[in-house]
């Protein structure tokens, strides 16, 4: 807050910045709900620190029993109520996605999921393979909502190709939890194609970050993986 007052600009920490970007990219009601859930969880985690800071500014000697204590409880209850509402709405999203996954399992075509670090080129590859126009720009988190298309490979085999949310190092737990319904699309894939930006100086650390998130989601170690090195030119 002191920095914001001095610089007269909005100051964000890393998690807050990621949430801001996610919020600006969310194009569907599902995406917006997931961003809202993550944002509310983030706000709840910062309540105590915010009020302690205000008490110090006012010259208070302690937090317990101060005016902030009553207000923080009121704020917490309000946020928890909103979290419950959003979670309830997301439950229908989870059910719908689950039904769609079951329907795809009945189809004779294997499902291939594209995963990778944000801005690695997943959406560009997806567009080339499917002749689609999914937003593919040189920006972080251009894709928030998973997209699925049926394509025919050169050998004649048909597959369902899925484009997913890009990952980032130390992805906040609240984001993984909020976007679980979306990220779990990877769990039902027959093959996971890990698209890597081979020209990036942190290509190896990025690879580890992606694998860490997949492990957190519960992707089996026996899952069929293909590594695709992008931007080699």
Predicted regions: what they are:
Residues 95-97, 103-110, 128-160, 168-181, ...:
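Switch I (effector-binding) loop of TRAFAC-class P-loop GTPase G-domains
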Residues 119:
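Walker A (P-loop) phosphate-binding loop of P-loop NTPases
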């Amino acid at each position: 807050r002191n920095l914001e007052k001095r610089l007269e600009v909005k100051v964000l920490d890393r998690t807050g910045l990621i949430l801001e970007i996610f919020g600006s990219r969310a194009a569907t009601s599902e995406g917006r709900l997931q961003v809202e859930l993550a944002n509310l969880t983030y706000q709840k985690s910062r309540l105590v620190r915010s009020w302690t800071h205000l008490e110090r500014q006012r010259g208070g000697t302690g937090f317990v029993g101060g005016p902030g204590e009553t207000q923080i409880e009121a704020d917490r209850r309000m946020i928890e109520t909103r979290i419950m509402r959003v979670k309830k709405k997301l439950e229908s999203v989870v059910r719908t996605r689950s039904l769609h996954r079951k329907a795809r399992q009945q189809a004779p075509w294997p499902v291939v999921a594209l995963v990778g670090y944000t801005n690695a080129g997943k959406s560009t590859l997806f567009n080339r393979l499917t002749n689609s126009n999914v937003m593919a720009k040189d920006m972080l988190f251009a894709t928030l909502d998973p997209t699925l298309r049926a394509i025919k490979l050169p050998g004649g085999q048909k597959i369902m190709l899925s484009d997913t949310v890009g990952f980032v190092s130390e992805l906040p737990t609240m984001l993984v939890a909020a976007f679980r319904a979306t990220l779990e699309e990877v769990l039902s894939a027959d093959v996971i194609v890990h698209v890597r930006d081979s020209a990036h100086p942190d290509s190896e650390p990025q690879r580890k970050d992606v694998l860490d998130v997949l492990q957190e989601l519960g992707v089996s170690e026996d899952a069929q993986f293909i590594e695709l090195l992008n931007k080699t030119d």
